[in-house]
From Swiss-Prot:
Its main location: membrane. SMART domains: HATPase_c, HisKA. The modification Phosphohistidine is found at H221. SUPFAM superfamilies: ATPase domain of HSP90 chaperone/DNA topoisomerase II/histidine kinase, Homodimeric domain of signal transducing histidine kinase. The gene is kinB. It catalyses: ATP + protein L-histidine = ADP + protein N-phospho-L-histidine. Keywords: ATP-binding, Cell membrane, Kinase, Membrane, Nucleotide-binding, Phosphoprotein, Sporulation, Transferase, Transmembrane, Transmembrane helix, Two-component regulatory system. It holds the Pfam family HisKA. One of its GO terms (biological process) is positive regulation of sporulation resulting in formation of a cellular spore. This is Sporulation kinase B. Residues 1-6, 59-68, 121-132, 188-428 are cytoplasmic. It comes from Bacillus subtilis (strain 168).
Length: 428
């Protein structure tokens, strides 16, 4: 019964910081998934590891058993190498200061346990939940094997002496199984929390889009008809005789340009109101990306911006090619307008990743702050002086209608990367 109490205590040490972080940091309502607070996660992970060392599960031949390595693995996968190494260093220092025999095992296992997460660190965010759990199980098996191997090596060198080898093997196996189970449980909970947060963000965005679409449907048609009449009478008003005056010609140009801008805004409203009008078919996304890039080259040249396109061949996808093309154009246009004149670089790529097709649009523009990224996609929010924000709102709707996701990774004055993920599965 005592050992069961120790096991439950260690489970609390590992899972409580995860749930605490979810409540205080990820529980904030936001359209986009909140950015990970690396410092806070690292602090929680260090605390969890130290508690596992202070309150070990049991002792045998002066060896402490615990779950102190699990926060290291979690930080390496979900935060960064620096975060994982910080937690690992805190574990090793605490072991050396207070539990020297255990530090021998930590020092032996640590390099091997760190290498595997670092090797898969870049691929980890794009793995499915099943693959992540499978990789975590592999790491646990490697840890158990290395633990047994280092135990016998240290015993053979008379550094540590295990008097009851049978009991040691049994307890080490039970401890290894327990560590594997808690690591898998932790990964599963983290992935479930991430899925729920993403779903919540989509629901918040969908509610806002529904309100805007209803408004667009009721207002757009009523406004478009008077604008058409106004445009016709403006052209009649500024006849050939009137246009001989230079100021009159400038007035006509200004009035017509503003009417065209109003017409464009109404068109965007109608695009949101007609989200049900999608003509889906199987098409080659790589060809669409190349075609869209070619169309945007002239606009980019006007802004002295270089556009590069890189796509894998035969990226077949099921969707509305016209709508997706509009979404890509909107994003590329925003990128071109965000980069400095004469020094701009836009790179668009498309590739398959399992059952997902990823489109990345990267620029070296002015970038965005976290607050600005949180508001992207909201109607009427724009980073441009004369912008309405409707173009990006329409883009969000198009991606959402194709059961995809769109995310932004940006640093102020360093550039932005837009990532679109679309399902690659074709209808049977």
């Amino acid at each position: 019964m005592e050992i069961l109490k120790d096991y439950l205590l260690h489970i609390c040490f590992i899972l409580f910081p995860i749930l605490l972080y979810q409540v205080f940091w990820l529980g904030k309502p936001a359209i986009l998934v909140p950015k990970i607070n690396s410092g806070l996660v690292t602090l929680f992970a260090c605390g969890a590891s130290v508690l596992c060392i202070i309150f070990p599960i049991h002792e045998m031949d002066y060896i402490q058993y615990g779950l102190q390595m699990i926060p290291v693995i979690i930080c390496l996968f979900y935060i960064s190498t620096a975060s994982g190494l910080t937690v690992a260093a805190s574990v090793l220092c605490f072991e050396l200061l207070f539990y020297e025999p255990s530090a021998m095992f930590v020092f032996t296992l640590l390099p091997f346990l760190i290498i595997i997460p670092i090797l898969f660190q870049k691929k980890w965010p794009f793995m499915s939940k099943a693959k992540k759990l499978l990789l975590s199980l592999l790491i646990s098996c490697v840890e158990i094997f290395l633990f047994f191997a280092s135990s016998w090596i240290l015993s053979a060198l008379n550094i540590l002496n295990f008097q009851k080898s049978g009991i040691f093997v049994y307890e080490a196996a039970v401890s290894g199984l327990f560590r594997s189970s808690v690591l898998l449980l932790s990964i599963y909970i983290i992935e479930s929390i991430a899925e729920n947060i993403a779903l919540r963000s989509q629901l918040i965005h969908s509610e806002k889009m529904t309100i805007v679409s209803e408004l667009a449907a009721s207002v757009a048609h009523e406004v478009r008809n008077p604008l058409t009449v106004v445009r016709g009478f403006v052209q009649l008003l500024f006849n050939d005789e009137t246009l001989q005056n230079k100021s009159s010609a400038d007035y006509k140009k200004l009035v017509l340009s503003e009417l065209d801008r109003a017409q464009g805004i109404i068109t965007n409203y109608l695009d949101m109101a007609k989200q049900q009008l999608y003509e889906k078919e199987v098409f080659d996304l790589s060809a669409l990306i190349k075609e869209t890039s070619s169309l945007m080259v002239s606009y980019a040249n006007y802004k002295s911006v270089t556009v590069e396109a890189e796509t894998e061949p035969d990226l077949l996808i099921y969707g509305d090619a016209t709508k997706l093309k509009q979404a890509v154009i909107n994003l590329m246009k925003n990128s071109i307008e965000a980069v400095p004149h004469g020094k701009g670089m836009i790179h668009i790529s498309a590739k398959r990743n399992g059952h997902t097709i990823m489109i990345n649009i990267t620029d070296n523009g002015v970038g965005m702050t976290d607050h600005q990224m949180q508001k992207l996609g909201e109607p009427y929010y724009s980073l441009k002086t004369n912008g309405t924000g409707l173009g990006l709102t329409v883009t969000f709707s198009i991606i959402e209608h194709h059961h995809g996701t769109i995310s932004f990774n940006s640093s102020f004055q360093k550039g932005t990367t837009v990532t679109i993920k679309l399902p690659a599965d074709l209808p049977h």
